[in-house]
Amino acid sequence: MQDLLNVLGLASSANKLISGETLFKKIIKNKIKLVLTVKDMGASQLKKINDKCAFYQVPIYNGLIDTIQLNQAIGKNNVKAIGIEDINFVKLILKNISKGDVNYGQTN
């Protein structure tokens, strides 16, 4: 899991992570290549982001890490969902997910 968190920190430093309302705007504009949500995200917000990603055909992984891990990795507070804009960071993240580096939480 540490490799995934390191990649997220690097992507954050490179300003390739999007969160908050900007995330929804960029999903609509097809700028987001991948969305990650935390294990402890609220049900209504999770449904909203899942529906948006499904409609605009954006890949999403739910519950890979928790809020504390994500916030420490990216250096921000109270972030529950992030979008990755850069395809190279997406490839690194998917590589870490596929090699079993991540403990999967409950996905919806």
Name these PLM-found stretches.
Residues 15, 32-34, 57-59, 79-80:
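Short active-site oxyanion
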Residues 3, 44, 48, 65, ...:
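Charged, alpha-helix-enriched surfaces in structured cytosolic catalytic cores
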Residues 55-79:
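Mid-chain, well-packed structural core segment of small domains
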Residues 71-108:
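C-terminal structural segments of small proteins and small subunits
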Residues 28-52, 59:
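N-terminal positively charged helical leader segments and presequences
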Residues 3-37:
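N-terminal first-folded block
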Residues 5-7, 24-26, 49, 69-74:
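Short, flexible, solvent-exposed loop/turn segments with mixed acidic/basic and small polar residues
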Residues 22, 40, 65-68, 87:
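Short, ordered loop/turn segments at secondary-structure junctions
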